[in-house]
Amino acid sequence: MINNQTLARPYAKAAFEYASAANGSDAWSGMLGLAAAVVEAPEVAELLRNPRLTRESKVEAVLRLFADDVDEAFRNFIANLGEHDRLFVLPTVREQFEAYKAEAEKTIDVELETAYELSAEQLETLAAALSKRLDRSVNPRQVVNPALIGGLVIRAGDLVVDGSVRGKLSQLAESLKS
């Protein structure tokens, strides 16, 4: 069975290539966010699953919800998705589009899980060091988790660095067990 990631990939790639060529990545990002929110709404999701409705009527219903918030190229994109009965993958298309966009702009979202709130200066210093290490512009987001005891856990894409006291204690406990 094909999953949503596989179904969404060609649409996300095509949308990103079109948006990049037209210098409209930010606009398409916004329109995809709107479209994803629309199809995730329970009423719309139910409408899209209704086997009695034709693909064309589903596309018309979704496009009516956008009103004038999307351009003609995006309307055609939605029509193409609907023609192939793929409107339900819009949230995944948006995620993949954002990943392509971040890759092109050399940016990365980084989660910094700390035991205590970091000061603005500490956050800035850490972001600068991570930016240099990852060779990307870093968008840091701090999460406070007192269970870490001290230190921090860094999550950037597939990279996870556990420099927390809790992590070190867990490693020590594992080494003592073996």
Curated annotation (Swiss-Prot):
Gene3D superfamilies: N-terminal domain of the delta subunit of the F1F0-ATP synthase
GO cellular component: plasma membrane; proton-transporting ATP synthase complex
Annotated GO MF terms: proton-transporting ATP synthase activity, rotational mechanism
Membrane topology: Peripheral membrane protein
Record key words, sorted: ATP synthesis, Cell inner membrane, Cell membrane, CF(1), Hydrogen ion transport, Ion transport, Membrane, Transport
Key word Ion transport present: yes
InterPro entries attached to this UniProt entry: ATP_synth_OSCP/delta_N_sf, ATPase_OSCP/dsu
Localization per record: Cell inner membrane
Record family assignment: Belongs to the ATPase delta chain family.
Function: F(1)F(0) ATP synthase produces ATP from ADP in the presence of a proton or sodium gradient. F-type ATPases consist of two structural domains, F(1) containing the extramembraneous catalytic core and F(0) containing the membrane proton channel, linked together by a central stalk and a peripheral stalk. During catalysis, ATP synthesis in the catalytic domain of F(1) is coupled via a rotary mechanism of the central stalk subunits to proton translocation. This protein is part of the stalk that links CF(0) to CF(1). It either transmits conformational changes from CF(0) to CF(1) or is implicated in proton conduction.
Binding partners and assembly: F-type ATPases have 2 components, F(1) - the catalytic core - and F(0) - the membrane proton channel. F(1) has five subunits: alpha(3), beta(3), gamma(1), delta(1), epsilon(1). F(0) has three main subunits: a(1), b(2) and c(10-14). The alpha and beta chains form an alternating ring which encloses part of the gamma chain. F(1) is attached to F(0) by a central stalk formed by the gamma and epsilon chains, while a peripheral stalk is formed by the delta and b chains.
NCBIfam families: ATP_synt_delta, PRK05758.2-2
Protein name: ATP synthase subunit delta
Recorded name of the encoding gene: atpH
